[in-house]
Amino acid sequence: MKIQLIAVGTKMPKWVEEGFQEYRRRFPHDMPLELVEIPAGKRGKNADIARILQKEGEAMLSAVPKGARIVTLDIPGKKWDTPQLAEQLEAWKLDGRDVSILIGGPEGLAPACKAAADQSWSLSALTLPHPLVRIVMAESLYRAWSITANHPYHRE
């Protein structure tokens, strides 16, 4: 099973890339974590936000591999603690499909992305900066994997 983070935004600061890569390289070969960056639409004073969201959503959905489980990252989604995320990860592995996790831009996700989702996950009730979300996601998924693999990374 491959896990793919599909995120709106490119040209992240170096610390974001380094943080994400630190956790990405820890994943086992049979569960690679990859990042697909979707260019953000140009936003300005007179920007058509609905149109920008639609375009970003189309690009995100076209990046999802055929047959992959789609999980949206959205505040109203399910709130999983670490053991629950580990259970989800195990269920995804047993399902046998790749997993694509969609991370929206400043205005969130397009309605089409939400409609296409198999699941919706709320990372936090807090509004987090999108660059930081990439690192938190990578670490959270790695920690969940470590629980399923009985790896000593996670401690209760």
Curated annotation (Swiss-Prot):
This is Ribosomal RNA large subunit methyltransferase H. HAMAP family: 23SrRNA_methyltr_H (MF_00658). It is found in: Cytoplasm. Its EC number is 2.1.1.177. GO terms for molecular function: rRNA (pseudouridine-N3-)-methyltransferase activity. One of its GO terms (cellular component) is cytoplasm. Specifically methylates the pseudouridine at position 1915 (m3Psi1915) in 23S rRNA. It catalyses: pseudouridine(1915) in 23S rRNA + S-adenosyl-L-methionine = N(3)-methylpseudouridine(1915) in 23S rRNA + S-adenosyl-L-homocysteine + H(+). S-adenosyl-L-methionine binds at residues 73, 104, 123-128. Belongs to the RNA methyltransferase RlmH family. It comes from the Bacteria. CDD domains: RlmH-like (cd18081). Keywords: Cytoplasm, Methyltransferase, rRNA processing, S-adenosyl-L-methionine, Transferase. Its main location: cytoplasm. The gene is rlmH. It comes from Vibrio campbellii (strain ATCC BAA-1116). The lineage of its organism: Bacteria, Pseudomonadati, Pseudomonadota, Gammaproteobacteria, Vibrionales. Homodimer. It holds the Pfam family SPOUT_MTase.
